[in-house]
Amino acid sequence: MRTLVILAAILLVALQAQAEPLQARTDEATAAQEQIPTDNPEVVVSLAWDESLAPKDSVPGLRKNMACYCRIPACLAGERRYGTCFYLRRVWAFCC
């Protein structure tokens, strides 16, 4: 019976130790979301993937380290439309 209590205590300590980093990550994510302005119709898209898995020339003309955004209603001057984004049940222009 003592062994069961000790194992349960160790399990609870381990679960609590894992929960604290999760809470810290949740707090960081909440703080990051609060910093995003809601009145701006611009959405920043950040993508990361393994370069070896990406199809070559999947988007002609798109270069590495190019800043791309989903915009409504159209791209800004100097940007080119490369496709479409679907966000918040709306269609946005994918501009780089």
Curated annotation (Swiss-Prot):
Localisation: Secreted
InterPro entries the record matches: Alpha-defensin, Alpha-defensin_C, Alpha-defensin_N, Beta/alpha-defensin_C
Coiled coil spans: none
Proregion span(s): 20-66
Record's keyword terms, sorted: Antibiotic, Antimicrobial, Defensin, Disulfide bond, Fungicide, Secreted, Signal
GO CC annotation, single: extracellular space
Disulfide pairings: 68-96, 70-85, 75-95
Subcellular location, principal: secreted
Highest rank taxon of the organism: Eukaryota
Any single GO BP term: disruption of plasma membrane integrity in another organism
Signal sequence coordinates: 1-19
Claim: 4Fe-4S is one of the keywords in the record: no
Keyword presence, Signal: yes
Family from the record: Belongs to the alpha-defensin family.
Its job: Probable antibiotic and antifungal activity.
Name the UniProt record assigns to this protein: Neutrophil defensin 8
Species for this entry: Macaca mulatta
